[in-house]
């Protein structure tokens, strides 16, 4: 698509970025208020981190906020599928987060209570019970696991399709692809966005630029937003070893930084190297680190022998977003200018983040979440030693 922004060029809200976060924000704003919304996406909707992801959706967060966001997202994915008359793309396989050390066991046991408080069905599964329920996992390695039966994953291309389709059906939303936002200036009553397809005026702007845009878009209005990008890697295997059940439940070895989920008749493994640092290239595609893959492979083959010695069908490495505490940013740091970022969990939290951003725009506050977990200002303050970071996250860089 080319040419100028068509139709009206004056909006109530301009969303910068048409990934999972920007699309869900536009969709929820339109459904709830009928506001006129423009989504400016410099490429194709959903084609940033969103379609490159593994799509894991877990309600087993590492804090109450994380658990609430996971629960709400799961519900919203399912509802959208129903509304569109299409499959939601969500598969509830059940999900084990395994504890390999005593320290993990203790904190995971505490988290079971936190998640239950947030309304998530969650239990501790001991080794004997684990062997009975999920015999394919090598429980010799573990001290137990937390488990939620209706966690799972969403197939990322379907999630992107549905969110794009939902936005496209809303009469008050215009989705502009190949529309890069290059400058943002304040004007009376709002903002003017200079884009590659002409000017857009809006009373309010939502920065949903993702790993490769949130920081840069905020900088256009002089704000410093600590959203960075780092490599995350995926491999898929076309099938499992002979006699293995399929689909099998997801599992996550947080300490080792990898997780395994079903993919078609085989499996997908996602992994992050704790030694990788923020990637400044600006690219979504990053070189795959085969040395790291070979170093970690024996670990997951030992934990889940169904994958032992299998050929790979696909392998890719891409930019994942992260924030310093792995929690999201949902804030209005300047009047009428909003920042939305997923802290690397934009598939499991994307729909809920869109809903919470709609709360903030329409009602002035994101309902049901503590401000200190989501505001931008938390990063500039002295660290409160009692404040919990989300420990159920990949080993993202510290800076
Ligand atoms: C390999 C991998 C695996 C992952 N697995 C999971 C997972 O299992 N579960 C999970 O929850 N999360 C996962 N993630 C993270 C998840 O994909 C992201 O958190 C999520 O997609 C972020 O959504 P977003 O909308 O913020 O970003 P994006 O999808 O990147 O969308 C941002 C959009 O903004 C656009 N943009 C940027 N700047 C501008 C500009 N100036 N003008 C116009 N448009 C602009 C970009 O083109 C892009 O399309 C994974 C990520 C990767 C890379």
Feature map (PLM): residue ranges:
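Glycine-rich FAD pyrophosphate-binding loop
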Residues: 30-50
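C-terminal catalytic lobe of FAD-dependent flavoproteins
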Residues: 298-399
């Amino acid at each position: 698509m080319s040419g100028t922004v068509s139709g009206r060029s004056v909006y109530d809200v301009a969303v910068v970025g048409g990934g999972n976060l920007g699309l869900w924000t536009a969709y929820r704003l339109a459904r709830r208020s009928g506001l006129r919304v423009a989504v400016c996406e410099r490429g194709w909707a959903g084609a940033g981190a969103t379609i490159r992801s593994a799509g894991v959706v877990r309600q087993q967060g590492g804090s109450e906020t994380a658990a609430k966001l996971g629960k709400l997202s799961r519900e919203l994915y399912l509802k959208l599928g129903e509304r569109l008359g299409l499959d939601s793309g969500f598969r509830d396989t059940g999900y084990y987060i395994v504890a390999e050390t005593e320290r993990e066991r203790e904190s995971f046991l505490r988290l079971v209570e936190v998640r239950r408080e947030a309304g998530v069905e969650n239990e501790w599964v001991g080794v004997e019970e684990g062997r009975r329920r999920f015999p394919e996992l090598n429980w010799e390695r573990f001290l137990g696991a937390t488990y939620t039966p209706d966690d799972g994953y969403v197939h990322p291309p379907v999630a992107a399709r549905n969110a794009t389709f939902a936005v496209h059906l809303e009469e008050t939303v215009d989705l502009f692809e190949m529309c890069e936002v290059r400058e943002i200036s304040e004007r009376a009553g709002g903002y003017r966005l200079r884009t590659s397809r002409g000017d857009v005026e809006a009373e309010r702007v939502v920065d949903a630029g993702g790993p490769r845009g949130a920081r840069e878009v905020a900088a256009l209005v002089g704000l410093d937003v600590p959203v960075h990008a780092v490599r995350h890697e995926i491999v898929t295997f076309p099938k499992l070893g002979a006699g293995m059940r399929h689909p099998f439940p997801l599992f996550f070895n947080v300490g080792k930084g990898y997780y395994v989920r079903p993919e078609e008749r085989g499996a997908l493994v996602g992994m992050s190297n704790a030694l990788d640092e923020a990637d400044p290239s600006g690219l979504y595609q990053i070189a795959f680190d085969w040395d790291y893959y070979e170093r970690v492979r024996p670990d997951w083959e030992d934990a889940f022998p169904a994958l032992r010695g299998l050929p790979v069908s696909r392998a890719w490495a891409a930019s994942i977003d992260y924030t310093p505490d792995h929690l999201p940013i949902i804030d209005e740091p300047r009047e009428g200018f909003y920042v939305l970022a997923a802290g690397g969990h934009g598939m499991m939290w994307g729909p809920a983040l869109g809903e919470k951003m709609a709360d903030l725009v329409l009602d002035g506050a994101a309902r049901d979440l503590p401000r200190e977990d989501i505001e931008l200002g938390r990063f500039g303050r002295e660290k409160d030693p009692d404040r919990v970071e989300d420990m159920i996250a990949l080993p993202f860089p510290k800076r």
